């Protein structure tokens, strides 16, 4: 899998974006063909699909965790299906405690703490496992643009800071599909980020299904130390902002590609940077689960989702069919 940082021209158009724009037509046409010629499979449970219309971190994982914890409070049997990013997975697998991130992906390992998880790179492979587990609800993390299965409820996550970038499709921009299509079809839209500033103009027409959410720290971390932050996630800027809002003194940071698998050399270099700055290393849970033996010298920032309108979410999730 190719791992990329979020290029600057994805946020603000420049000559590179315009050069790549014709290739975006090909991407759009291939997506159109998939939807035209595929008949969706109806899974034997209610399907809640959480996705986004752009590349990069938009808070999907935290939304899935929130949903999982919500369903637990209602004693509803559920299964989480994840995309196994960054893994060498060949077949759909029920995630076990002994699985590594290389085997099933970082998100799968994290979400397995919140419920039963099926990791897969091919949504068509999950059907036998779904029949085996017999859940009442299936939470699908990502696969929003995948036409191979029917979705009962769709939730689109939007990052407040990046929104829809430069408005171009991949590779000229960050979009997997144009927002008007995704948002119009969605049952709920999560706007993830600092709630100040109101609703962006681009989302105003979707206010009746909009939930504003913030990702807040849930860890108890010593604020009297210096920290050197690093991450290999889709939206590292939001991680660094969360650290700042938590009141930590960040003396430096390093960004790695999304879903990056750390080498021993990386960890040694990070340790040297931290030592030089008289600081302690700090990272995200997604990065922390991939570090292995070095995790005892690194602080992990855990986060949770806080939403402004839980009643709207409950109404959509628990409405009678």
UniProtKB/Swiss-Prot annotation:
The cysteines joined by S-S bonds are none
Known EC number = 2.7.1.130
Among the Pfam families in the record, one is LpxK
Q: Where does ATP bind?
A: 54-61
Show the GO cellular component annotation of the record.
Answer: plasma membrane
UniProt GO BP: lipid A biosynthetic process; lipopolysaccharide core region biosynthetic process
Q: Which GO terms label this protein's molecular function in UniProt?
A: ATP binding; tetraacyldisaccharide 4'-kinase activity
User: Does Transferase show up as a keyword for this record?
Assistant: yes
Q: Which reaction does this chain catalyze?
A: a lipid A disaccharide + ATP = a lipid IVA + ADP + H(+)
Asked whether the UniProt record includes Cytoplasm among its keywords, one would answer no
Alphabetically ordered keywords of this record: ATP-binding, Kinase, Lipid A biosynthesis, Lipid biosynthesis, Lipid metabolism, Nucleotide-binding, Transferase
What metabolic or biological pathway is this protein involved in? Glycolipid biosynthesis; lipid IV(A) biosynthesis; lipid IV(A) from (3R)-3-hydroxytetradecanoyl-[acyl-carrier-protein] and UDP-N-acetyl-alpha-D-glucosamine: step 6/6
Q: What class of enzyme is it?
A: transferase
Q: Which InterPro entries match?
A: LpxK, P-loop_NTPase
The entry's family comment says: Belongs to the LpxK family.
Its annotated function is as follows: Transfers the gamma-phosphate of ATP to the 4'-position of a tetraacyldisaccharide 1-phosphate intermediate (termed DS-1-P) to form tetraacyldisaccharide 1,4'-bis-phosphate (lipid IVA).
Give the protein's recorded name.
Answer: Tetraacyldisaccharide 4'-kinase
Q: Which organism is it from?
A: Rickettsia bellii (strain OSU 85-389)
Gene field:
lpxK
């Amino acid at each position: 899998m190719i791992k990329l940082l979020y290029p600057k021209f994805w946020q603000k158009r420049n000559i590179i974006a315009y050069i790549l724009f014709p290739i975006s037509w090909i991407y759009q046409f291939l997506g159109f063909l998939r939807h035209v010629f595929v008949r969706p499979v109806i899974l034997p449970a209610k399907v809640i699909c959480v996705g986004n219309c752009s590349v990069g971190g938009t808070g999907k994982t935290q939304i899935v965790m929130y949903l999982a914890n919500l369903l637990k409070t209602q004693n509803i049997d559920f299964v989480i299906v994840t995309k196994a990013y960054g893994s060498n997975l060949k077949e759909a697998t029920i995630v076990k405690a002994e699985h590594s991130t290389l085997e099933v992906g970082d998100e799968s390992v994290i979400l397995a703490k919140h419920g039963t998880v099926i990791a897969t790179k091919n949504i068509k492979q999950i059907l036998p496992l779904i029949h085996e587990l017999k859940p009442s609800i299936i939470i699908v993390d990502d696969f929003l643009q995948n036409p191979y299965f029917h979705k009962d409820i769709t939730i689109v996550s939007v990052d407040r800071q990046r929104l829809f970038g430069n408005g171009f499709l991949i590779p000229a921009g960050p979009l997997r599909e144009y927002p008007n299509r995704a948002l119009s079809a969605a049952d709920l839209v999560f706007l993830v980020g600092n709630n100040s500033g109101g609703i962006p103009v681009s989302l105003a027409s979707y206010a009746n299904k909009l939930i504003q959410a913030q990702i807040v720290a849930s860890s108890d971390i010593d604020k009297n130390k210096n920290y050197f932050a690093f991450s290999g996630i889709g939206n590292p800027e939001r991680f660094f902002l969360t650290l700042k809002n938590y009141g930590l003194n960040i003396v430096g940071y390093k960004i790695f590609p999304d879903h990056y698998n750390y080498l021993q050399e990386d960890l040694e270099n990070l340790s040297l940077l931290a030592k030089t700055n008289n600081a302690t290393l700090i990272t995200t849970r997604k990065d922390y689960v991939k570090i292995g033996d070095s995790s005892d010298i690194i602080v992990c920032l855990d986060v949770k989702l806080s939403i402004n309108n839980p009643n709207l979410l409950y109404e959509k999730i628990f409405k009678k069919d």
